[in-house]
Amino acid sequence: MRAVVQRVSEAKVIVEEKTVGAIKRGLLVFVGVGKDDTEEDCEWLADKVSGLRIFEDEDGKMNLSVKDINGEVLVVSQFTLYGDCRRGKRPSFTEAAPPDKGKALYERFVELLREKGLKVETGKFRAHMHVHLVNDGPVTILLDSSKLF
């Protein structure tokens, strides 16, 4: 699984002119599921995201997690994180999971974050979404359960 994690002051997702998920201070997490991903990848990613210390402590040092600051998480599915642009000009998405598997692991990831006590909002799987955010920092982290980066 891959994720782009952004520290935000606020974020929201709009589908068909309706806000379907919104948070204040916390993390916006774009998540992509690969065709070979498993429950273990979900667990690794949920652990990493929930414990990622990218919020500043009283000394201004990045030392606190989203849970430490009582922040919120907005999770948005994004299969295009598996776009392969090494050849040609159009990305290939052959490494992305098929929709049924992608949805199941995406929903499991959200469930695992909630089990860790986090307040989680979501976008809508397979929908065309407009994502609005105020990136705080900016701080943007790339994660990959295959540890490719």
From Swiss-Prot:
GO biological process: D-amino acid catabolic process
One protein family per Pfam: Tyr_Deacylase
EC numbers on record: 3.1.1.96
Annotated compartments: Cytoplasm
Keywords from the named record: Cytoplasm, Hydrolase, RNA-binding, tRNA-binding
Principal localisation: cytoplasm
The keyword Transmembrane is annotated on this UniProt entry: no
Reaction equations catalysed: glycyl-tRNA(Ala) + H2O = tRNA(Ala) + glycine + H(+); a D-aminoacyl-tRNA + H2O = a tRNA + a D-alpha-amino acid + H(+)
UniProt superkingdom: Bacteria
Motif (Gly-cisPro motif, important for rejection of L-amino acids): 137-138
Coiled coil: none
Single GO term (MF): Gly-tRNA(Ala) deacylase activity
The keyword Cell cycle belongs to this UniProt entry's keyword annotation: no
InterPro entries given in the database record: Daa-tRNA_deacyls_DTD (IPR003732), DTD-like_sf (IPR023509)
Any Gene Ontology CC annotation: cytoplasm
Complex formation: Homodimer.
Family recorded in the similarity comment: Belongs to the DTD family.
Functional summary from the UniProt entry: An aminoacyl-tRNA editing enzyme that deacylates mischarged D-aminoacyl-tRNAs. Also deacylates mischarged glycyl-tRNA(Ala), protecting cells against glycine mischarging by AlaRS. Acts via tRNA-based rather than protein-based catalysis; rejects L-amino acids rather than detecting D-amino acids in the active site. By recycling D-aminoacyl-tRNA to D-amino acids and free tRNA molecules, this enzyme counteracts the toxicity associated with the formation of D-aminoacyl-tRNA entities in vivo and helps enforce protein L-homochirality.
Domain notes: A Gly-cisPro motif from one monomer fits into the active site of the other monomer to allow specific chiral rejection of L-amino acids.
Protein name: D-aminoacyl-tRNA deacylase
Organism: Thermotoga petrophila (strain ATCC BAA-488 / DSM 13995 / JCM 10881 / RKU-1)
